[in-house]
Structure formats: structure tokens, C-alpha cells
């Protein structure tokens, strides 16, 4: 729906970073790309490493590692407008600008985008608005950048499976999400606001320092704020699910809102050495997630049928090195220690479960992740490698 797979790997097994900062959600270990609208317009590169990747920050990576690097501010000023349109009223408008380098050291760059579509499936519209802004100082040995991007999305639910029977009865574009029953004339009715709504704001402060021709370090602080909810119509369901009745047999129609508000912040750093046949990196990071989940029933503004809080603290240190011991043949070693503390407090959205509010999860995890390998470039464009890794 809004996920990316690598060789069929579940998205929760893929580690995704931007400028080395963890981008995957700390709880689900997934990145929902609908919250990154038009981010590709500001990328310098995207590196995808299949399998267990080298040590990085954020969630564990069993299937792949993806690192996105945002583009540099160019030396020349420009203003650009990109317009595109397609089937099902799909459209994209992007305005871009850059100051170029001011006084040979300063610059600012930005983008404003609007993306939308009515969708192939019935009512499956998409409304995405986003911006990207960066400003910084660029010296011979020092680069300091402030980067921020924002995304506001609204999408109609379209994640239900459509059976062959439903397609034969109602057409290939049939979407059962939001079904409310039939009116007096036998026409199907659907809930207009069966939507997902989310706002996400990202901030990064990046410092790159070159110490000499072989040595440099990078330090990045980051903060992400997310707020949103999805609303859905529940038809003829037991009211006890929302605490609206004590009778398990009493049923009714309910419009529920499941809401989320979260903060994710931390810092990462690395020291890098590269000279002759040896390259090495020592680094690590500390990150914390603090999220509130709560549910409301439309029509009862002061009523919450659940609220819980989850916190996740994650820190790691790693060292990795590669050495070319023969022409075209190199060996690498990569060692990482990672610690995770995860707590969650009830009640959950299963009404009445552990309603005393005790922590139902309070666990610490420690991981040691070694990786070793040999790489042999025996012909131009031909490479043989073997590796062993634990993630």
C-alpha cells in the first residue's frame, strides 16, 4: 500500500536512513512512504544494500539497508517548475529554488510539492502536500547544514482484498472500505471520511568536519514529530469493543478514530579514516521514541476508549574496517553492539485489557552483530565476494 520490498523481504526487515538518521518507524520498523511525498526530488543518491547490511543506525536490517543522501546546494541560483499529469486525475506540481552560493560559503534551497490522484479503485483518492528546505555554511573543511521537510497526507482506505466474486459483481475497481450497507433503493452506501490522515515534520542539523586528507567526522542531531489518525466506519459490531456497553451481545454502528502522536529524536556520529589500503569508521548513535496511541468515537468528543504510551530507547556503537591486502582483494570486519529498551503502558485498543494501567512491556535487549567478508575484483566489472553476518 505504501511500502517498499527488496527481493520480497517484509518492509519491517529493511533498515532505512536519510543522511544516516533512522527513518523507519521505531515501533513498527517500517517506513510508510506516503509520509515522504516527493522526497526523491531532493535526493543526491539512494544506496540499496541487499541482505544483512553493514552497521548503521536505527532498526535491525535482515533483508536490506537503504540509505538516502539529500542533495547538496548547487553553486548557481535557479528556480524551477515541474508539472505532470496522468490517468485517474493523477497530478504532481513541484516548485524548486536555490540561492546558489552566497559570499562563496552560504546557501539556501527549497521545494514545494503537491501530489494527488482519484485512484484506480473507487474513492481511493490521494492528497499529498510537502516541502523541503535546507540552509547551510560550506567551507573548505567545514560544512554545517540545517535540513527540514514536512508532509501532510490524506488518503482514502483501499487496503481491503477484492475477491473475484466482488469484481464480477461490482467491477474491477470495487473498493469495500467504508461500506455502510444499502439504502431503501438497494444502492450501496459508503462512508465518505474513511481516510488516513497524517502530518510529519523532520529536522536535521548536520556537521561535517574534515580534519586532514585522511580523517573526517560527522555529527547529526535530529527530531521528528508525527501526528495523525485514521477514521473508519464499523457496521453492526459489538459495542463492548468501545466500552459503549457492558452487554457483549449488543451491537451497533460506530465511527472510530485511532490517533497517534509521537516524538523521535537523537544524535548520530562517526569518525572516518581513509588512506592507502585501509579505510575505517567508528561510530554510533542514541535515539528515543515517545508515542501516544489513543482512540475516540465520533459523536462523543470527550470520550476515549483507550490510551497508551510507548517509549523506545535505542543506542549503538560500531567499528568497521576494510583493508586491501592484495591488489583487487580486500577483507572487511564490522562489529556492532546495540541496546534497546522498550516500554508500553496499557490499556490497548482491545477495550478492558489490563485497564489498571500497568506497564505490559518493559524489556531490555542487547545485541552483538559481527560481520566479516572478503571481496575480490578479478576483472573489470566482475567481482566475487563472500561474507558472514549476524543481524
Where are these regions (language model features)?
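Short acidic/polar hinge/loop motifs at secondary-structure boundaries
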Residues: 3-5, 22-50, 69, 166
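Outer-envelope beta-barrel architecture signal
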Residues: 14, 75-79, 91-93, 102-108, ...
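Extracytoplasmic loops and strand-loop junctions of Gram-negative outer membrane beta-barrel proteins
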Residues: 28-29, 48-49, 77-80, 114-118, ...
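A beta-strand signature from Gram-negative outer-membrane beta-barrel systems
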Residues: 37-80
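Transmembrane beta-strands of outer-membrane beta-barrel pores
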Residues: 83-89, 101, 114-118, 139-141, ...
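Transmembrane beta-barrel wall of Gram-negative outer-membrane proteins
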Residues: 85-116, 121-158, 203-213
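Acidic/polar loop-and-plug regions of large Gram-negative outer-membrane beta-barrel proteins
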Residues: 143-204, 231-252
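Face-selective signature of the C-terminal outer-membrane beta-barrel domain
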Residues: 197-352, 364, 370, 375-381, ...
Amino acid at each position: 500500500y505504501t511500502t517498499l520490498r527488496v527481493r520480497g523481504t517484509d518492509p519491517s526487515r529493511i533498515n532505512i536512513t536519510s543522511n544516516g538518521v533512522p527513518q523507519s518507524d521505531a515501533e513498527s520498523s517500517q517506513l510508510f512512504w506516503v509520509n515522504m511525498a516527493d522526497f526523491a526530488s531532493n535526493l543526491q543518491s539512494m544506496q540499496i544494500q541487499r541482505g544483512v547490511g553493514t552497521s548503521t543506525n536505527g532498526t535491525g536490517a535482515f533483508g536490506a539497508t537503504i540509505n538516502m543522501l539529500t542533495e547538496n546546494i548547487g553553486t548557481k541560483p535557479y528556480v524551477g517548475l515541474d508539472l505532470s499529469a496522468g490517468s485517474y486525475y493523477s497530478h504532481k506540481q513541484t516548485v524548486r529554488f536555490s540561492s546558489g552560493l552566497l559570499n562563496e560559503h552560504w546557501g539556501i534551497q527549497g521545494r514545494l510539492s503537491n501530489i494527488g490522484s482519484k485512484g484506480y479503485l473507487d474513492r481511493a483518492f490521494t492528497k499529498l502536500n510537502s516541502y523541503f528546505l535546507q540552509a547551510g555554511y560550506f567551507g573548505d573543511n567545514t560544512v554545517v547544514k540545517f535540513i527540514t521537510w514536512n508532509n501532510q497526507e490524506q488518503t482514502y482506505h483501499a487496503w481491503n482484498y477484492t475477491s473475484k466474486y466482488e469484481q464480477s459483481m461490482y467491477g474491477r475497481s470495487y473498493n469495500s472500505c467504508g461500506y455502510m450497507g444499502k439504502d431503501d433503493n438497494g444502492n450501496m452506501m459508503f462512508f465518505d471520511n474513511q481516510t488516513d490522515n497524517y502530518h510529519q515534520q523532520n529536522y536535521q542539523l548536520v556537521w561535517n568536519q574534515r580534519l586532514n586528507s585522511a580523517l573526517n567526522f560527522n555529527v547529526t542531531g535530529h527530531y521528528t514529530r508525527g501526528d495523525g489518525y485514521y477514521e473508519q466506519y464499523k457496521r453492526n459490531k459489538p459495542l463492548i469493543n468501545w466500552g459503549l456497553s457492558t452487554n457483549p451481545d449488543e451491537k451497533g454502528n460506530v465511527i472510530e478514530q485511532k490517533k497517534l502522536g509521537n516524538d523521535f529524536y537523537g544524535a548520530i556520529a562517526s569518525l572516518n579514516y581513509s588512506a592507502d589500503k585501509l579505510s575505517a569508521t567508528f561510530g554510533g548513535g542514541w535515539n528515543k521514541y515517545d508515542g501516544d496511541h489513543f482512540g475516540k468515537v465520533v459523536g462523543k468528543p470527550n470520550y476515549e476508549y483507550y490510551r497508551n504510551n510507548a517509549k523506545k530507547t535505542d543506542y549503538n556503537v560500531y567499528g568497521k574496517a576494510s583493508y586491501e591486502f592484495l591488489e583487487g582483494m580486500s577483507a572487511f570486519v564490522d562489529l556492532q553492539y546495540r541496546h534497546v529498551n522498550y516500554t508500553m503502558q496499557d490499556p490497548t485498543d482491545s477495550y478492558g485489557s489490563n485497564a489498571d494501567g500497568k506497564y505490559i512491556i518493559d524489556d531490555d535487549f542487547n545485541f552483538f552483530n559481527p560481520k566479516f567478508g572478503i571481496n575480490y575484483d578479478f576483472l573489470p566489472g566482475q567481482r566475487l565476494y563472500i561474507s558472514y553476518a549476524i543481524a
